[in-house]
Amino acid sequence: MNKQQLFENIKRKKSFLCVGLDTDIKKIPEHLLKEEDPIFAFNKAIIDATADLCIAYKPNLAFYESMGVKGWIAFEKTVKYIKENYPDQFIIADAKRGDIGNTSAMYARTFFEELEIDSVTVAPYMGEDSVTPFLTYEGKWVILLALTSNKGSHDFQLTEDANGERLFEKVLRKSQEWANDERMMYVVGATQGRAFEDIRKIVPNHFLLVPGVGAQGGSLEEVCKYGMNSTCGLIVNSSRGIIYVDKTEKFAEAARLAAQEVQVQMAEQLKAIL
């Protein structure tokens, strides 16, 4: 999926919502535990209930890998289900990979060749040769960690060099030498607020994947005020605030209502550019 197709989906659905599939076997409704594959059964119900309200899904690999082979099978089935039934959805593998070149090449092969996923989150700490293997696949995206929403982001990402440049700013500037805004996005946490204004001075045209709205306390209005550009430029993720709002047999209906509430807010924000 290219940048224009992504923007067309945003305009059509009046939404830039990404539903995070952070599926924890300990948190799904109890009645699903009797299913042959409880994780996939949960994901399928959430996807069917929200697909017309969002433009992306983001399975977090840690939740699947923690269950071993069963978890990976559920992940593969989830990706396949989205691709076959909702082909307009942008799929993000939230894997946060990034290693020496030949290792990154294997990670890239997993997500882009074997699973044919649209994008993968990548950690930039090891530099260019850890990222470029992901960029050899035409039509696929790298979503580079830039400024995250966790408290620990202050430990490294906000530290300044002798010239006053913060580490996340250096990541943004340097990585533009590796790919343009048709191949690369950045993770910027919703809790970072006014930092979006500084980020847009460096990467005015790139899409930003924004976690942290909802359960983590980020403000959608503030993110849009400082982060939205002429093609929206935002994919805002919500996980717990949608998928875990109800643990009864009506969990999917409740998830839909939660997603709908966010979509309505997004439609209002999009009026500024549409």
Swiss-Prot record:
Active site per database record: K96
Enzyme class: lyase
Coiled coil spans: none
Domain of life: Bacteria
Single GO BP term: 'de novo' pyrimidine nucleobase biosynthetic process
SMART domains: OMPdecase
Name of this protein: Orotidine 5'-phosphate decarboxylase
Organism: Bacteroides thetaiotaomicron (strain ATCC 29148 / DSM 2079 / JCM 5827 / CCUG 10774 / NCTC 10582 / VPI-5482 / E50)
